[in-house]
Amino acid sequence: MPQLSPRVQALVQPHLRDLDVYDPNFTPTRINLSANENTYDVPASARAAIDEALAATHSNRYPDPLSNELRDELAAWHGTDRAHVIVGNGGDELLYNFLLAFGGPGRTLAICPPTFSEYAFFASLTQTDVAEVWRDPETMLADEDALVDAAGKANLVILTSPNNPTGDLAPVALVRRLCEACPGLVMVDEAYGEFAAPGSSCESLLDAYDNLVVLHTLSKAFALAGARCGYVLAAPDVVEALAAVRQLYSVNVLTQAAALTAVRLRDEFAPTVAAIVSERARVLAALRELARTRELAVWPSEGNFLLVRVPGASEVRQRLRDEHSILVRDFSYAPGLADCLRITVGTPEENDAVLAALGELLPAAGPSDSLQALS
């Protein structure tokens, strides 16, 4: 918090004084492919039902603090019961509560960077130590044996599948090994799971491992990022612990109404998910073709985004914004992601625009260009 006055700086808890305000530097642009949102929006038929549900919702009343009607619907969808489900204000609240309830001074969280930065951030808020098992800088894949070894020495593990921003899946067999190795809890963040190959979810392990926690969100496949609704599937005692530390009324009545309607109409979102998966394959192929003549590398992904490496990534990001009104996420500042940009898979028109812009902006590849080999 470098901008604080000396008076307030002295009042802030010591372990929080070096934190910065989260500012993704969003800029109004013609095309925003920076935040892994679902750029297709909610299907029209589902949107009409959500609007009807919102109109019937009384905002003068406090919400059900446990979102029980929504919990029941989510439980029915996932083949379990309410006791195994907790709802939160987006996945972020549930991630923070996970570290708040089970982390803390003297405890260690194992993660596998590059990955979602909020894991380490919430660990710092709760004074939880972090053990980092870095991915291979070329393949961006995890060192599974090293991660299992770290899990055996940690209190908590968080693994993302598909991983943000690298896009790779955590094999179910690896999750099984982590659950067996870790003396505490293993969370698998499946925020992008709907875009992944069928059968890749680790939910099938929940009955066998009571230390497994699976995180989901309605922000991605359900196009409800602005509503802020996530949920966790876990053993009942884990759910109880998470419920005990949560803020009261954190999921408001409008979010509960919208989420309940969306989950009931979940089949209507399947065509959009299929379209994004199809576009992801098309954009990946187009980027690989572009890499034949431009300095570019791209990694395959199971999410609704692709990670690319280009020379001068920060400048490319700025020129995309300034010259083409296209916003992508610059990760070149992050350890392990030098010269990397993350591009959300959008509509065909949005994807065509970013492909054309990259073809214009990127330098021609030399005969011995090493970036192409990474793709």
Predicted regions and their residues:
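Phosphate-binding glycine-rich loop
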Residues: 68-108, 310, 314
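PLP-dependent aminotransferase class I/II
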Residues: 43, 211-291, 297-298
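N-terminal "arm"/small-domain region of PLP-dependent enzymes with the aminotransferase-like
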Residues: 1-61, 152-153
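Conserved PLP-binding catalytic core of the aspartate aminotransferase-like
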Residues: 277, 281, 290-324, 373-375
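Short hydrophobic/aromatic beta-strand micro-patches
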Residues: 233, 307-309, 344-346
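PLP-dependent aminotransferase-like
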Residues: 101-159
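Active-site pre-lysine segment of PLP-dependent enzymes
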Residues: 124, 141-153, 165-186, 190-224, ...
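PLP-dependent enzyme catalytic core of the Aspartate aminotransferase-like
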Residues: 173, 322-323, 333-375
